[in-house]
Amino acid sequence: MNENLFASFITPTILGISILPLIMIFPCLLFSAPNRWMPNRLVALQLWLVRMVTKQMMSMHNKQGRMWTLMLITLIMFIASTNLLGLLPYTFTPTTQLSMNMGMAVPLWLGTVLMGFRNKPKSSLAHFLPQGTPTPLIPMLIIIETISLFIQPVALAVRLTANITAGHLLIHLIGSATLALSSISLTVSTITFTILFLLTILEIAVALIQAYVFTLLVSLYLHDNT
């Protein structure tokens, strides 16, 4: 029987019941609230991440935009945690599901767009028609700008899904090759294992970078509408 490369991306079930919500809640359990007066290393790391994200993403926002600070910090920590969770053996990565990523991207994008239409409707409508556009091109440009606006959440979700899925497929392929070559040639198997180790380190970086890129783009959409 041939192995299905996408079997690891199928939503896991136990007795026909999806355990995806449990997997999504698991990262929150890792970052539990401290019960001591003195912070430990984990709390210090969390505070450092909060300060870094706040400095990098929220410094360009006005007062209305900074109201999203906690949401964006929660978003980047959630995406990074779920991406890293998928690198553990016998685990499932929720961010490889396009439906979940669309479920995150669409509400956040829609919230920024609605905020823009509420706070500065003239400026938001002006994006659909650049200044100085020739009259014959006005209908076509309005259609193009409208399509580009609605493509934003799709691009957010597809980018995250494609990058995480591609990395997991490469790890799966090279890991299977390493296991198959271990009984044929120890030298070649060692080389492929070294490649697998380096690729795993690269995927850790990709998991963190994709979480940062997703949150940064949401922050830029928010900045354009506040």
Curated annotation (Swiss-Prot):
<keyword id="KW-0999">Mitochondrion inner membrane</keyword>
<dbReference type="GO" id="GO:0046933">
    <property type="term" value="F:proton-transporting ATP synthase activity, rotational mechanism"/>
</dbReference>
<comment type="subunit">
    <text>Component of the ATP synthase complex composed at least of ATP5F1A/subunit alpha, ATP5F1B/subunit beta, ATP5MC1/subunit c (homooctomer), MT-ATP6/subunit a, MT-ATP8/subunit 8, ATP5ME/subunit e, ATP5MF/subunit f, ATP5MG/subunit g, ATP5MK/subunit k, ATP5MJ/subunit j, ATP5F1C/subunit gamma, ATP5F1D/subunit delta, ATP5F1E/subunit epsilon, ATP5PF/subunit F6, ATP5PB/subunit b, ATP5PD/subunit d, ATP5PO/subunit OSCP.</text>
</comment>
<dbReference type="InterPro" id="IPR023011">
    <property type="entry name" value="ATP_synth_F0_asu_AS"/>
</dbReference>
<protein>
    <recommendedName>
        <fullName>ATP synthase F(0) complex subunit a</fullName>
    </recommendedName>
</protein>
<dbReference type="InterPro" id="IPR000568">
    <property type="entry name" value="ATP_synth_F0_asu"/>
</dbReference>
<dbReference type="GO" id="GO:0015986">
    <property type="term" value="P:proton motive force-driven ATP synthesis"/>
</dbReference>
<feature type="transmembrane region" description="Helical">
    <location>
        <begin position="14"/>
        <end position="34"/>
    </location>
</feature>
<keyword id="KW-1133">Transmembrane helix</keyword>
<dbReference type="GO" id="GO:1902600">
    <property type="term" value="P:proton transmembrane transport"/>
</dbReference>
<keyword id="KW-0406">Ion transport</keyword>
<dbReference type="GO" id="GO:0005743">
    <property type="term" value="C:mitochondrial inner membrane"/>
</dbReference>
<feature type="transmembrane region" description="Helical">
    <location>
        <begin position="164"/>
        <end position="184"/>
    </location>
</feature>
<feature type="transmembrane region" description="Helical">
    <location>
        <begin position="138"/>
        <end position="158"/>
    </location>
</feature>
<keyword id="KW-0813">Transport</keyword>
<keyword id="KW-0066">ATP synthesis</keyword>
<keyword id="KW-0138">CF(0)</keyword>
<keyword id="KW-0496">Mitochondrion</keyword>
<comment type="similarity">
    <text>Belongs to the ATPase A chain family.</text>
</comment>
<feature type="transmembrane region" description="Helical">
    <location>
        <begin position="193"/>
        <end position="213"/>
    </location>
</feature>
<feature type="transmembrane region" description="Helical">
    <location>
        <begin position="97"/>
        <end position="117"/>
    </location>
</feature>
<keyword id="KW-0812">Transmembrane</keyword>
<dbReference type="InterPro" id="IPR045083">
    <property type="entry name" value="ATP_synth_F0_asu_bact/mt"/>
</dbReference>
<dbReference type="GO" id="GO:0015252">
    <property type="term" value="F:proton channel activity"/>
</dbReference>
<dbReference type="Pfam" id="PF00119">
    <property type="entry name" value="ATP-synt_A"/>
</dbReference>
<comment type="function">
    <text>Subunit a, of the mitochondrial membrane ATP synthase complex (F(1)F(0) ATP synthase or Complex V) that produces ATP from ADP in the presence of a proton gradient across the membrane which is generated by electron transport complexes of the respiratory chain. ATP synthase complex consist of a soluble F(1) head domain - the catalytic core - and a membrane F(1) domain - the membrane proton channel. These two domains are linked by a central stalk rotating inside the F(1) region and a stationary peripheral stalk.</text>
</comment>
<keyword id="KW-0375">Hydrogen ion transport</keyword>
<dbReference type="InterPro" id="IPR035908">
    <property type="entry name" value="F0_ATP_A_sf"/>
</dbReference>
<keyword id="KW-0472">Membrane</keyword>
<dbReference type="GO" id="GO:0045259">
    <property type="term" value="C:proton-transporting ATP synthase complex"/>
</dbReference>
<feature type="transmembrane region" description="Helical">
    <location>
        <begin position="68"/>
        <end position="88"/>
    </location>
</feature>
